[in-house]
């Protein structure tokens, strides 16, 4: 994720315009089991990383096209890549 042209660098993440709607959107994805990890980079305003539990990069793009912040050009999907996990937190090989 990368800041869009309407990101306000004078404000923190939770102070950006339409934060409540963006937070509800992200919470819904999390509640549906679609977000595995997510959070902003440091320093604030440097973008964010989101790891989704989806099958394709296209599915990730389609999901984030509905983000209220994407509609307002506040935070945009910079790149979507498909990723194969070989090791989990316990060091086991994933298949």
Where is each model-derived feature located?
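Conserved, structured core segments of small domains
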Residues: 1-95
């Amino acid at each position: 994720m990368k800041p869009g042209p309407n990101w306000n660098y004078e404000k923190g993440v939770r102070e950006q315009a339409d934060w409540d709607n963006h937070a509800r959107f992200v919470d819904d994805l999390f509640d549906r089991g679609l977000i595995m990890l997510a959070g902003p980079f440091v320093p604030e305003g440097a973008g964010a990383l989101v790891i989704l539990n989806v099958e394709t990069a296209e599915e990730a793009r389609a999901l984030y096209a509905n983000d209220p912040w994407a509609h307002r050009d506040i935070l945009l999907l910079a790149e979507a890549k498909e990723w194969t996990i070989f090791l989990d937190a316990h060091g086991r090989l994933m298949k």
